């Protein structure tokens, strides 16, 4: 069986007040992704800050266990970057590419992605076109 490709999108400070969660704010592209993928309706933030929440999603550990008790740009870091899901995916044969911001390390190289596509800022108008370009050019599978 061919392993499925995985596209992990994590928007910054979006919240749940968007269309897929039953609210009136139209987000047709997010709705389409929710219709065709996975939508988590019974999830919660593991930490009160961006870095701690992201680190929990990417390691499967609470912030007090993974070390990300504050913001990465304020000096907090993971205890062990080998716990990042990227390493688990690589061991399963996946290729990983980062487009935009991960916000669990000031040095993106420590995360372990196979490729990092740098954009000047993490705003959607810069990140989305780069993501579309990478996907259209094609990636070795699985990704």
Please provide the spans of the model-predicted regions.
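Formylglycine-dependent sulfatase
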Residues: 1-143
């Amino acid at each position: 069986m061919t392993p499925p490709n995985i596209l992990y999108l994590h928007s910054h400070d979006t919240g749940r007040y968007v269309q897929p969660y039953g609210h009136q704010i139209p987000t047709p592209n997010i709705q389409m992704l929710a219709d065709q993928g996975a939508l988590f309706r019974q999830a919660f933030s593991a930490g009160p800050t961006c870095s701690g929440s992201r680190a929990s999603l990417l390691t499967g550990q609470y912030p007090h266990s993974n070390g990300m008790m504050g913001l990465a740009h304020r000096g907090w870091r993971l205890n062990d970057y080998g716990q990042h899901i990227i390493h688990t995916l690589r061991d399963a044969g996946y290729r990983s590419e980062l487009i935009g911001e991960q916000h669990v390390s000031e040095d993106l190289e420590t995360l372990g992605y196979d490729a990092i596509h740098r954009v000047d800022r993490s705003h959607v108008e810069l990140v989305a076109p780069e993501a579309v370009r990478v996907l259209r050019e094609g990636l070795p599978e699985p990704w």
